[in-house]
Amino acid sequence: MPKKTIKIVVEGGNVKPGPPLGPTLSQLKLNVGEVVKKINEATAQFKGMTVPVTIDVDLDTKEFEISVGIPTTSSLLLKKAGAEAPSGDPAHKKIANVSLEDIIDVAITKKPSLTAKTLKAAVKSILGTARQIGLTVDKKD
C-alpha cells in the first residue's frame, strides 16, 4: 500500500485547481475538483491566511487524507492587525499596531510548532516576526 505525501502552502478557503496543485494531483490520477473542494472546506476558517496543507494519497485505492496545519505567523499577525500585506520596507514604513495581548495570543497558538521552550521565548520570536513585517507593538517599534 504505497503512499505519497504532498505538502503545499495555500490561501485558506481559496484553493484553485490550477498549477501547481492541479498537475500534481492529475499525475496521481485523483479527481482534482474533489480534492480542491475538500481543501477549501478544511481551510475555510483561515480565509485570507496562508496555511500549510498536507495531502496523503494512497496510490492503490486513490483515497486521500487532508491535514491542515497552523497558519503562518505573519498571517496570524496581519489578521490581528487588520492589515492586508506586510510592509515592503519595515524599517521605515510601519503598517499597523498590535497589542502585547495579541502577540501573546499568537504565541500561544503557534507554540506547538515553534522550537521555543517557554512562552517567553515564543513571544520574543513572534515579536521578531512582527517587527520584520512592519508592525508596531503597543505603539513601540
From Swiss-Prot:
Keywords, A to Z, come to: Ribonucleoprotein, Ribosomal protein, RNA-binding, rRNA-binding
Could you tell me which PROSITE patterns the record lists for this protein? RIBOSOMAL_L11
Q: Which SMART domains match?
A: RL11 (SM00649)
Q: Name one GO molecular function term.
A: large ribosomal subunit rRNA binding
Top-level lineage group: Archaea
Q: Per the record's keyword annotation, is RNA-binding included, yes or no?
A: yes
Entry function: Forms part of the ribosomal stalk which helps the ribosome interact with GTP-bound translation factors.
Per UniProt, subunit arrangement is: Part of the ribosomal stalk of the 50S ribosomal subunit. Interacts with L10 and the large rRNA to form the base of the stalk. L10 forms an elongated spine to which L12 dimers bind in a sequential fashion forming a multimeric L10(L12)X complex.
What this protein is called in its record is: Large ribosomal subunit protein uL11
Organism listed in the record: Acidianus ambivalens
